[in-house]
Amino acid sequence: YAESEGEILKSFMQKWAQHREMVAKMTDIVRENGLFGLQAEEKMMRWMFASREEKSGKLWRAINNDNVLECQTMESNSVDLIVTSIPFSNHYEYTPTYNDFGHNEDNGKFFEQMDYLTPELMRILKPGRLACIHVKDRVLFGNATGDGMPTIDPFSEMTVFHYMKYGFRYFGMITVVTDVVRENNQTYRLGYTEMCKDGSKMGIGCPEYVLLFRKLPSGTSRAYADLPVTKNKSEYSLARWQIDAHASWKSSGNSLLSYEDMKGAGIDKIRHLFRNYEREHIYNYEEHVSFAEELEAYGKLPKTFMAVDPVSKKPWIWDDVTRMRTLNTKQSQKKRQNHICPLQLDIVERLIERYSNKGELVFDPFGGIGTVPYCAINLGRKGLSTELNYDYWKDSLSYLYEAEMEVSAPTLFDLMSDAV
């Protein structure tokens, strides 16, 4: 600043000091007395959900209701498979109602509310069948905890012990790999610049998990389900099962993949070739980093998503889930409200195909915009969902009608056979 602007600077610094003093005083007042006005306004806006609405087709039912109340009316042993993504404690609120599972003070209060739902899920699930629960550990930000750095709340582990408390047998966890670059663009907790300043404060990305719980069958001598989930050997071969179970990958013997081999290709092609190469060769960390650095040197390393993420060879770690393949894509196309935590279609489809038979009933107590029943219909099953948020429930209806029309639409050969 120029010497002639000295008084301006002095005035600015004085005002800035007054501002900081005012902020400090207001912060102390809020800490001591709370935000009474906001709390009162919130209480006036919040209400107890007391209505119920149901729509159905030949292959599905969708109910706008509190899932605890709805499950209490369902028959015992009436559901073949449960696939759901439970709320991540009080991380989000989906409705301004007291019934909302996200409207809780902490994890303890959240699981107290779950204590009313989980026993009902155990009761309505058929013996020997599964409840597949999608969860994710929560990031606790330093400005909220006072630690000054992000830490992780082991929500998935709490969920395991909660379901076991009500008789579910825990027997597996599927890891769904997430894109650490996309995650950082949302949370800013894994920034490269901050890591260079002090790497000791940096953790890792948070994967998602599908927790597998089973209700014991009536007879435990061989532990077959009362109605087993069978596979036709002509459609599901021994060879396929061995590969699925053991992830046995053979190397083709190709030479080391170099960026020079594909520098003219687009990022989609580069990503495809890299993943194929990784699956066929023994993993080498230094080669992985070197390849990514070559991409960066040529200006082809994206900053909005991870182009050369680690590839898994294990069947219980799913690294090929398409993050954008959710019903939110259709929501955006139709200019509707997006779901806060959309469940990927890939995850649901795999669970339904693996753990249910065609024609069976798949239930989602946290139905959202209808992902689970939508996938169930498309895979030859029946779908059932409950959802508290009216807008989400209403949006789900169009997808369920659409799915039923697609699978029920007669083909030309059907019409010809009817004519004959």
Label for each model-derived stretch:
Residues 31-38, 230-239, 417-420:
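Amphipathic alpha-helical surface "interface" segments used
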Residues 1-47:
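A conserved SF2-helicase RecA2
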Residues 24-33, 223-228, 407-416:
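Short, flexible loop/turn segments with low-complexity composition
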Residues 48-70, 398-420:
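S-adenosyl-L-methionine
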